[in-house]
Regions:
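Glycine-rich loop(s) and the adjacent beta-strand/alpha-helix scaffold that form part
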Residues: 169-178, 183-195, 223, 334, ...
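N-terminal FAD cofactor-binding segment of flavoenzymes
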Residues: 175, 182-241, 281-290
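Conserved redox-cofactor binding core of oxidoreductases
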Residues: 102, 106-109, 114-143, 252-346, ...
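Rossmann-like flavin
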Residues: 74-76, 81-86, 90, 94-95, ...
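N-terminal Rossmann-like FAD-binding beta1-loop-alpha1 element of flavoenzymes
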Residues: 151-179
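Extreme N-terminal leader/targeting segments of oxidoreductases
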Residues: 4-5, 17, 24-32, 68, ...
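Near-N-terminal "mature-domain entry" segment
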Residues: 1-67
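FAD cofactor-binding and catalytic pocket of flavoenzymes
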Residues: 231, 249, 394-521, 568-573, ...
């Protein structure tokens, strides 16, 4: 909680960002979200921010005037916040971004906070709920008592792309299986096309996850089925040149053997291009690429019976998305696997270097699972955190984190685009994928709903932001998926929670600059009226503008943390496979130094995949699980 004086200050900040919203409701919702995440430091940081902006002496140093924020008029408050946004001090920039993102997301995502009034201005209308599938998902969570010990042959930690496949392979081979999933269970009737509920229910840290400095927003699923429940269904195989790289790093079987696993996975999750229809945003990307003579291809997706509602990022109410929950996990349960949701694996237990099981917390109940084998599939953030809490994985555990940083580029078009409508991703271009050997970026588009848009769009003043939001239905975003080579790291805090450290630097920073410039050119070629970057002071180019000057301006401004919007939906590495001692796991995905411990998620990647990783996670999980079961 925060005290009354701090709440009053927070209300004034929220009212500055969005005067048309209900500032009191927004302020209380911010506190509620941070409390729900359950990390006391987040609230402590908020209190510090609120105290600083009310301290006259501090503000002499920070903004050059002995003022209290709450004493300023609206224009003075806006100028104050811009000083924080534009500051050379990283902590001030991150403080601004934290409160700005929360305030604006809540204002546009919650009816009582302002969305009832603000959403109609954007041109957004919530779609009618799609018809439920004939057979909704029906995976019941195992009932457990405090202090209970369960037993199985194989304990799988995580139920996403890798965990579900590993659970099925083990159960199909006749092993007894228990799956521990930190997120909640769900069924299609629980899924509604509302951002606030979907983010809180289905995403890590309620959709608010980020690197420790807030420089990169992290989107990661945390629910039964993991990221496959909330992703955009893009199903791409690992390119041949990157497979060769991985082979050189010791991850064997990347050729014909992996193709067999890809084919099996594609068949089970029904990957196809039959229903990959272009919406206006994907059509704009294709049109711009065509105009520039650049290649593009149709994206295969794991969907059947898609209703084109565009709200795939918050789960598929129609059951058309062939997530791991509806496919492999359902198959595993049919073969006897047991599932426990809302259950966090805390430590891996061992005796003399051999796995004996897992300790876990399910609400207020502490349980133990005895198992001959443990499969780690909690993702590239959750898996290393579990290894680090357990003192396993060696010095490389948590290192070599890759994020595919995305510096999105925004443009206004003369015709309606409605980024939230239709198939989210249907076009991908690898025209820029090999600008520096195997490094570059692939161009795609994201589905963007008003809450996420409001949080990400540049804020220079309340009026400026509202003006952009009022034209939201005519904006399109292109997202360059940058294959990064400079890794980050996952650590844990004193409570064992994951901390993600990552900086876009060196060659990756240069590639992000190039990605912004090339994305802008594609927008212009597609007929955009104006293109703007996501810098806190946006750089704008219009048709006929000087692209050389634009590129120079982007290069000069750079991509330092919290000076430009950056997000990641692909977290990889941190328990990478390889033949050398620098790898956490061997070429079979077995963790070095601990018998019976295996990796089956994106943390096993030796480096960045360069393409959306879901299909590769599933294929590798199938391969690694089968190798494990042969031992």
């Amino acid at each position: 909680m925060i005290g009354p004086p701090e709440r009053a200050t927070l209300v004034s900040v929220c009212g500055t960002f969005v005067p048309e919203g209900n500032a009191g409701v927004i302020a209380d919702a911010i506190v509620g979200e941070l409390e729900a995440i359950g990390r006391p430091k987040l609230l402590a940081d908020l209190r510090l921010f609120l105290r600083l902006i009310e301290t006259r002496a501090v503000n002499v140093v920070l903004v050059g005037r002995p003022v209290r924020f709450s004493d300023l008029a609206q224009d003075g408050r806006e100028a104050y916040l811009r000083r924080w946004a534009d500051s050379r001090i990283p902590l001030l920039r991150s403080g601004f971004q934290a409160v700005k993102r929360l305030s604006l997301f809540i204002a546009y995502a919650r009816p009582e906070a302002g969305a009832a009034k603000l959403l109609p201005e954007t041109g957004y209308s919530r779609p009618d709920p799609l018809a439920l599938p004939e057979r909704p998902l029906a995976i019941a969570s195992l009932a457990v008592r405090d202090g209970e010990t369960l037993g199985c042959d194989v304990c799988v930690v995580g139920s996403g792309a890798g965990g579900a496949v590993a659970a099925f392979e083990a159960a199909n081979a006749g092993r007894s299986v228990i799956v521990l999933e930190r997120g909640p269970g769900w069924s299609e009737p629980d899924l509604v096309p509302r951002e606030s509920e979907g983010s809180a229910r289905l995403f890590w840290d309620r959709g608010l996850a980020a690197t420790v400095d807030l420089g990169v927003v992290l989107f990661a699923g945390r629910a039964l089925g993991g990221g496959t429940v909330v992703n955009w269904m893009t199903s791409l195989r690992l390119p041949d040149d990157i497979r060769a790289e991985w082979e050189a790093l010791g991850a064997d079987g990347m050729g014909a053997e992996l193709d067999e696993h890809y084919a099996a996975v594609e068949e089970r999750i029904e990957v196809n291009t039959d229903e990959t229809v272009q919406n206006a945003q994907n059509a704009a990307l294709a049109r711009g690429l065509d105009a520039l003579g650049k290649p593009w291809s149709v994206i295969p997706r794991n969907a059947r019976g898609c209703g084109d509602c565009g709200h795939c990022g918050y789960g598929c109410r129609a059951g058309a998305k062939r997530s791991s929950a509806r496919t492999y996990l359902t198959d595993a349960v049919a073969r006897g696997a047991r599932v426990l949701t809302d259950c966090e694996a805390r430590t891996i237990t061992t005796t003399n270097g051999v796995v004996t099981g897992v300790t876990a917390v399910a609400g207020d109940r502490h349980i133990s699972v005895r198992a001959d084998r443990v499969v780690l599939a909690g993702g590239a953030i959750g898996t290393p955190a579990l290894l680090l809490r357990s003192g396993l994985g060696g010095p490389a555990a948590g290192r070599r984190l890759f994020l595919h940083p995305v510096p999105a580029v925004f443009a206004r078009y003369p015709e309606p685009i409605r980024m939230w409508s239709g198939v989210p991703q249907s076009v991908v271009s690898d025209a820029f994928a090999r600008l520096d050997g195997t490094y570059g970026f692939r161009l795609e588009v994201p589905p963007v709903l008003p809450g996420v848009a409001a949080a990400g769009i540049v804020w220079r003043s309340a009026a400026h932001h509202r003006e952009t939001m009022r034209a939201l239905d005519r904006f399109a975003a292109f997202i360059p998926i940058v294959r990064d080579r400079e890794p980050g790291r996952v650590r844990v805090d004193r409570d064992g929670a994951a901390l993600v450290s990552y900086a876009v630097r060196g060659a990756d920073a240069a590639m992000c600059v190039r990605a912004i410039v090339e994305s802008a050119k594609v927008h212009l070629a597609a007929g955009a009226l104006a293109v703007r970057t996501f810098h806190t002071r946006p750089i704008v180019i219009e048709p006929g503008g000087d692209t050389t000057a634009f590129a120079a301006a982007v290069r000069s401004r750079g991509v330092a943390a919290n000076t430009v919007g950056m997000f990641s939906a692909h977290q990889m590495g941190t328990a990478g496979m390889g033949s050398g001692s620098a790898s956490v796991s061997d070429p079979d995905g077995a963790v070095r130094g601990t018998r019976g411990l295996h990796v089956a998620d994106a943390s096993a990647f030796p480096n960045a995949s360069g393409v959306n990783p879901m299909l590769t996670v599933m294929a590798l999980a199938r391969r690694n699980a089968r190798r494990m079961l042969r031992v």
